[in-house]
């Protein structure tokens, strides 16, 4: 489990390798990750967009930007949480992900909430970084 907190917004990520959706002979490794976003602050916020930086085991960077997460732009009041699970295919048995969520307060102020850097690793495969 990996965790970051920005301005009272806690982001926790739990990744896992999904063997049944992977095909190592075809250089396809699929990882799922579950994210829990908790508003520990005093103000209501809305998740507006996401920005991911995905780096495979060869060092190739892919950036992904988009509105919301899993088709939603959740609003979180103080003490509320939102969880979702998504996935990421890689051409290597390991890599990393990190990023930010753009959050907006009720008065229209925007800020970036950090998504912690986390590793994607096939169990029992030695990690080689380039």
UniProtKB/Swiss-Prot annotation:
The record's listing under SUPFAM superfamilies reads:
ApaG-like (SSF110069)
GO annotation, biological process = error-free translesion synthesis
What NCBIfam families does the database record attribute to this sequence? PRK05461.1
Among Pfam families, the record links this protein to: DUF525
Q: Which residues form the ApaG domain?
A: 3-127
Q: Which InterPro entries has this protein been placed in?
A: ApaG_domain, ApaG_sf, Uncharacterised_ApaG
The name under which this protein is listed is: Protein ApaG
Mark the transmembrane ranges.
none
